């Protein structure tokens, strides 16, 4: 595993990330959500992808792809491990979303190329990173109340918004993936909340991936 070459590739790709809004359809008709996990002790990478209508946020399609894991877990290089399964799930979708939420980081990454940015570049679709844990950078003062907001900074560069979406919950790290500005990323996440910690696109992707009761009920109603 030539990490130096991968690091160089990350830096080159990161330079191509568009940090301003460029949605082909605004407002979007379909918003996607993507979530990646691992099965069989990491040997299989599983990606779940969902499509929701906007503004209703109703689930209209889901796909799950499983591929053999192509590289080990190496912090900072997770996107190389996750994108093959994401691409497989993406290609299975009968329609493509106008905006995609990815469970993971966008530019809030040591080399500014988290999975949301990497995958957004691969498919050239507007993406937003919605991560649950900090990867790098420093958080400003963040209140305990729901809606509390602080920037995630690295020196003078803002990497994400840190946003407490729900009371007594850890905050989310919301960042530009590709073709979505930082403030727009936050705005779209806020618009896609329905009372849970996660926005609906990644909440549904997680529900599909983990076969949570909400998804099992949805399947029963749509069979």
Curated annotation (Swiss-Prot):
Enzyme's top EC category: hydrolase
Pfam family, one: Endonuclease_5
Gene Ontology MF annotations: deoxyribonuclease V activity; magnesium ion binding; RNA endonuclease activity, producing 5'-phosphomonoesters; single-stranded RNA binding
Keyword Transferase: no
GO annotation terms (biological process): DNA repair
Cofactor(s) named in the record: Mg(2+)
Keywords carried by this UniProt record: Cytoplasm, DNA damage, DNA repair, Endonuclease, Hydrolase, Magnesium, Metal-binding, Nuclease
Cellular component aspect of the GO annotation: cytoplasm
UniProt site (Interaction with target DNA): 73
Residues that bind Mg(2+): 35, 103
Domain of life: Bacteria
InterPro entries for this protein: Endonuclease-V (IPR007581)
Entry's EC annotation: 3.1.21.7
Claim: Magnesium is one of the keywords in the record: yes
Reactions mediated catalytically: Endonucleolytic cleavage at apurinic or apyrimidinic sites to products with a 5'-phosphate
Subcellular localization, as worded in the UniProt entry: Cytoplasm
CDD domains recorded: Endonuclease_V
HAMAP family in the record: Endonuclease_5
Functional description taken from the UniProt entry: DNA repair enzyme involved in the repair of deaminated bases. Selectively cleaves double-stranded DNA at the second phosphodiester bond 3' to a deoxyinosine leaving behind the intact lesion on the nicked DNA.
Entries under NCBIfam families matching the protein: PRK11617.1 (NF008629)
Family, per entry: Belongs to the endonuclease V family.
Name of the featured protein: Endonuclease V
Gene assigned in the entry: nfi
